[in-house]
Amino acid sequence: MAKTGKKFRAAAALVDRDKRYAVAEGFQLLKKTVEARSTKYDQTVDVSINLGVDPKHADQMVRGAVVLPHGTGATVRVAVFAKGEKATDATNAGADVVGAEDLQKRIEEGFLDFDTVIATPDMMGVVGRLGKVLGPRGLMPNPKVGTVTMDVAKAIRDAKGGKVDFRAEKAGIVHAKLGKSSFEVEKLEANFNALVDLVMKLKPAAAKGVYLQGIAISSSMGPGIKLDTMEIKTRHG
């Protein structure tokens, strides 16, 4: 939905575009912008983090995963590539679909009714054949974010319990979900702090200059709210 119309303008009028808000103040303001839209839709709350990195260089890539303490508020559908005992573990842990070559074939035929993919290491030969399908959608399992693992049960629990995978895009910007607009401010802040703490710890040694260059939060139907990077650097160092 386009961010236009009277309700969006009313929400945007609450935000000083030239101000960098303290974190607590920023989330309180975000809740006010949601109220100004007066929609029954439970919007997603997002964060954009502008980093001083060039992801085109492998030694400057920022990538990771964090389990948000209060989850994302979203229902996550999990597909698992596994065989034998690990397939049974995946089913028992609540995976939405489990398979091997049969699942590969379904995906090649157009099945994409899932939000994340987990695989045991021995299945990566099968999963690798789906690179052109899963890769562009950000669904390819990766050991760096815990989606290539023998402990499929834990990976499934994490995925369904609020795990967020993130990576710096071409311009060095990390986009991630923090929860829903119905969340209490304290829960949104806690999720934000968990994510930012990890992003700051992942600063590449090869990154030069200012690492945290800008950060903003918004609801899916609301204006962006810029936050004070100095406060965040002091808190998360």
UniProtKB/Swiss-Prot annotation:
<dbReference type="InterPro" id="IPR016095">
    <property type="entry name" value="Ribosomal_uL1_3-a/b-sand"/>
</dbReference>
<dbReference type="InterPro" id="IPR023673">
    <property type="entry name" value="Ribosomal_uL1_CS"/>
</dbReference>
<comment type="similarity">
    <text>Belongs to the universal ribosomal protein uL1 family.</text>
</comment>
<comment type="function">
    <text>Protein L1 is also a translational repressor protein, it controls the translation of the L11 operon by binding to its mRNA.</text>
</comment>
<protein>
    <recommendedName>
        <fullName>Large ribosomal subunit protein uL1</fullName>
    </recommendedName>
</protein>
<dbReference type="GO" id="GO:0006412">
    <property type="term" value="P:translation"/>
</dbReference>
<keyword id="KW-0820">tRNA-binding</keyword>
<comment type="subunit">
    <text>Part of the 50S ribosomal subunit.</text>
</comment>
<keyword id="KW-0694">RNA-binding</keyword>
<dbReference type="InterPro" id="IPR028364">
    <property type="entry name" value="Ribosomal_uL1/biogenesis"/>
</dbReference>
<dbReference type="GO" id="GO:0003735">
    <property type="term" value="F:structural constituent of ribosome"/>
</dbReference>
<dbReference type="InterPro" id="IPR002143">
    <property type="entry name" value="Ribosomal_uL1"/>
</dbReference>
<keyword id="KW-0687">Ribonucleoprotein</keyword>
<dbReference type="Pfam" id="PF00687">
    <property type="entry name" value="Ribosomal_L1"/>
</dbReference>
<dbReference type="InterPro" id="IPR023674">
    <property type="entry name" value="Ribosomal_uL1-like"/>
</dbReference>
<dbReference type="GO" id="GO:0006417">
    <property type="term" value="P:regulation of translation"/>
</dbReference>
<comment type="function">
    <text>Binds directly to 23S rRNA. The L1 stalk is quite mobile in the ribosome, and is involved in E site tRNA release.</text>
</comment>
<keyword id="KW-0810">Translation regulation</keyword>
<dbReference type="InterPro" id="IPR005878">
    <property type="entry name" value="Ribosom_uL1_bac-type"/>
</dbReference>
<dbReference type="GO" id="GO:0022625">
    <property type="term" value="C:cytosolic large ribosomal subunit"/>
</dbReference>
<dbReference type="GO" id="GO:0019843">
    <property type="term" value="F:rRNA binding"/>
</dbReference>
<keyword id="KW-0689">Ribosomal protein</keyword>
<dbReference type="GO" id="GO:0000049">
    <property type="term" value="F:tRNA binding"/>
</dbReference>
<keyword id="KW-0699">rRNA-binding</keyword>
<keyword id="KW-0678">Repressor</keyword>
